[in-house]
């Protein structure tokens, strides 16, 4: 029951993802961070098979870092998204990754942006996007309330509405979410929305 969604506001982009590590009917942990910081001004929120998700996002992160190391300048968000799409398309003909990605970033020239990349290497620049079962509810909620000139506070309020809708509509809804933001000041954690915490000590 993975849920990943994001939106672009006035000078920033926000992505949110559930934090449940699930296999079949088993929940392994409630604090799995599915949003990776690619570099100082890029975020990748991913859903899909856990092994593919971790391996592919780390592969993209290392290649983005390698490009900056070799050339002395970072990739733009559009370039990083196109690189990611290209790698997914190449793998699709050999050993496909079951992973869907929302890439958010901020560039000095073009500002904040959000890219939708699915497991068959479809790439679109979007104002809002979502993957997983939660997309049925988060997309409709964002369609109703989203504006391109939203402030950070308004965008977070909309994200909370989406999380509430997902929790109230899905039979097996993920309890916890992580929210991250990227703007001119960089990519960073914004908040966690927790209704369940991992039990770290055994109960006798």
From Swiss-Prot:
One Pfam family cited in the UniProt record for this chain: Proteasome
Q: Name one GO cellular component term.
A: proteasome core complex, beta-subunit complex
- InterPro entries in UniProt: Ntn_hydrolases_N (IPR029055), Proteasome_alpha (IPR050115), Proteasome_beta2 (IPR035206), Proteasome_bsu_CS (IPR016050), Proteasome_sua/b (IPR001353), Proteasome_suB-type (IPR023333)
Q: Which GO terms describe its biological process?
A: proteasomal protein catabolic process
- Localization of this protein: Cytoplasm; Nucleus
Q: Which keywords fit this entry according to its UniProt record? A: Acetylation, Cytoplasm, Nucleus, Proteasome
* Positions carrying N-acetylmethionine: 1
Q: What is its main location?
A: cytoplasm
Q: How does it assemble?
A: Component of the 20S core complex of the 26S proteasome. The 26S proteasome is composed of a core protease (CP), known as the 20S proteasome, capped at one or both ends by the 19S regulatory particle (RP/PA700). The 20S proteasome core is composed of 28 subunits that are arranged in four stacked rings, resulting in a barrel-shaped structure. The two end rings are each formed by seven alpha subunits, and the two central rings are each formed by seven beta subunits. The catalytic chamber with the active sites is on the inside of the barrel.
What is this protein for, i.e. what is its function?
Non-catalytic component of the proteasome, a multicatalytic proteinase complex which is characterized by its ability to cleave peptides with Arg, Phe, Tyr, Leu, and Glu adjacent to the leaving group at neutral or slightly basic pH. The proteasome has an ATP-dependent proteolytic activity.
Q: Which family does it belong to?
A: Belongs to the peptidase T1B family.
**Protein name listed in UniProt:** Proteasome subunit beta type-2-A
This chain is encoded by the gene named PBD1
């Amino acid at each position: 029951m993975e849920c990943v969604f994001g939106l672009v506001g006035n000078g920033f982009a926000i992505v949110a993802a559930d934090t449940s590590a699930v296999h079949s009917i088993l929940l392994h942990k409630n604090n799995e961070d599915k949003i990776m910081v690619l570099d100082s001004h890029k975020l990748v929120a991913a859903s899909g098979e856990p092994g593919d998700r971790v391996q592919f996002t780390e592969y993209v992160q290392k290649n983005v870092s390698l490009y900056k190391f070799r050339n002395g300048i970072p990739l733009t968000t559009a370039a990083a998204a196109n690189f990611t799409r290209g790698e997914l398309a190449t793998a699709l003909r050999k050993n496909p990754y079951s992973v869907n990605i929302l890439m958010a970033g901020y560039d000095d020239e073009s500002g904040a942006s959000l890219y939708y990349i699915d497991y068959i290497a479809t790439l679109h620049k979007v104002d809002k996007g979502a993957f997983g079962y939660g997309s049925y509810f988060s997309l409709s909620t964002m369609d109703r309330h989203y504006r391109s000139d939203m402030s950070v506070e308004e965008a977070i309020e909309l994200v909370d509405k989406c999380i509430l809708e997902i929790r109230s509509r899905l039979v097996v809804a993920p309890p916890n979410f992580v929210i991250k933001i990227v703007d001119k000041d960089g990519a960073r954690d914004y908040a966690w929305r927790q209704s369940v915490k991992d039990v770290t000590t055994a109960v006798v």
